[in-house]
């Protein structure tokens, strides 16, 4: 029974990931708000998992195990996203409005659109390469989904504006340089953290709007 349920959930996820976003508010047939949220959460989860897998593979390939802890501590304040007043976890996110969380999610996603365009060149001969070379398209797709939700929920509240003025550097393809390796390692760490934030915000919004048994996270 559990296997059948898992299979059905997986098939639903695959189906939702293949659905297009409505291009206009008046598009027909209109997608229910619950489906828009479900679609966005699935895409964010997929991207977060991809970012985590990519980070781990890079770490295994290039960062000596004995150096990982000290490097990770040094990277604690590296991410530009730490400079914006976005919630740092689920509890803080629950104190913000849906529109605030959508705007922060959008800022986080947009800050990576430039840097990830070189990501696939960092992972030659990589098991992750088959998906990492499509990260840009996946980010654009999630950006579009968040914008669709914002159109549906537009409430006239003040916009957060261009808070994240500084985007991330691009990934360095010179993997023979120790500095480049450390830079890429730091970027991948931030990429993983930022996508986790975006996923958390979207899940908080979905759960408080549509009470369901899968809200615990």
Curated annotation (Swiss-Prot):
Zn(2+) binds at residues 46, 199. The keyword Zinc applies. It comes from the Eukaryota. One of its GO terms (biological process) is growth hormone receptor signaling pathway. CDD domains: somatotropin_like. InterPro entries: 4_helix_cytokine-like_core, Somatotropin, Somatotropin/Prolactin, Somatotropin_CS. One of its GO terms (molecular function) is hormone activity. Keywords: Disulfide bond, Hormone, Metal-binding, Phosphoprotein, Secreted, Signal, Zinc. It holds the Pfam family Hormone_1. Belongs to the somatotropin/prolactin family. This is Somatotropin. It comes from Xanthonycticebus pygmaeus (Pygmy slow loris). The lineage of its organism: Eukaryota, Metazoa, Chordata, Craniata, Vertebrata. The gene is GH1.
